[in-house]
């Protein structure tokens, strides 16, 4: 039986599935672009459910095309647009709001507030990041402050956060694995790079 490595390459404008053989040579690629949403100036959003559906359908497509099944897969890797932020209901898997993309600038005002409060050194020393709307933490704050469903789910202890890799892993495993890795976590402005743990 032929064996392959499957890579989910979830980018800013498209999702792609790549199969590599055991020599790490590309065997096949399938790809699909998805819609970008620009509801206000400086805002950029994605539909995380659409991304999940595309990834799932692309995996099915590459399996059908090459007459493969899960037994042909050695392992799965995920690359993604790291700072893009998804918050979802852990019971249903449904996002409470569209994914806020790394390019989005809606949290600039909150960032300026943190800078005025002299939080730059504290945050930099813990995360290695400058205060900027580019990173996930300020996007999370915006969703919690502006989406009533998010606050409701926090009270019920049913709100999950993740970068896109985390959301896809959670969906791929039927809601059993809520994980990311240090490379993604370190772009959230919530991860302490000295302790290699989420900061409090």
Each language-model region and where it sits:
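Carbohydrate-associated surface elements
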Residues: 104
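Short, glycine- and charge-enriched coil/turn segments that flank and shape catalytic ligand pockets
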Residues: 64-71, 92, 118-120, 148-159
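Flexible glycine-/small-residue-enriched beta->alpha junction loops
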Residues: 110-117, 132, 138
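A broad, structural surface signal
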Residues: 49, 53-60, 64, 112, ...
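N-terminal glycine/serine-rich phosphate-binding loop of ATP-dependent small-molecule kinases
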Residues: 1-97, 109, 125
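Acidic/polar active-site rim loop that often engages polyanionic ligands
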Residues: 90-94, 117-127, 143
């Amino acid at each position: 039986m032929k064996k392959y490595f499957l890579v989910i390459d979830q980018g800013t404008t498209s999702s792609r599935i790549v199969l590599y053989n055991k020599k790490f040579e590309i065997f096949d690629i399938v790809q699909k672009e998805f819609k970008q949403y620009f509801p206000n100036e400086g805002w950029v959003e994605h539909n995380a459910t659409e991304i999940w559906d595309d990834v799932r359908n692309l995996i099915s497509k590459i399996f059908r095309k090459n007459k493969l099944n899960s037994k042909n897969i050695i392992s799965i890797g995920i690359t993604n647009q790291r700072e893009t932020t998804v918050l979802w209901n852990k019971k249903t898997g449904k996002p409470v709001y569209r994914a806020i993309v790394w390019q989005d600038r809606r949290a600039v005002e909150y960032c300026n507030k943190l800078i005025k409060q002299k939080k730059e050194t504290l945050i930099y020393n813990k995360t290695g990041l400058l205060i900027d709307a580019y990173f996930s933490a300020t996007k999370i704050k915006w969703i919690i402050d502006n989406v009533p469903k998010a606050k409701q789910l926090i009270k019920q202890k049913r709100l999950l956060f993740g970068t896109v890799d985390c959301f896809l892993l959670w969906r791929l495993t039927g809601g059993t694995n809520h994980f990311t890795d240090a490379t993604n976590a370190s772009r959230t402005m919530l991860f302490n790079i000295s302790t290699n743990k989420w900061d409090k």
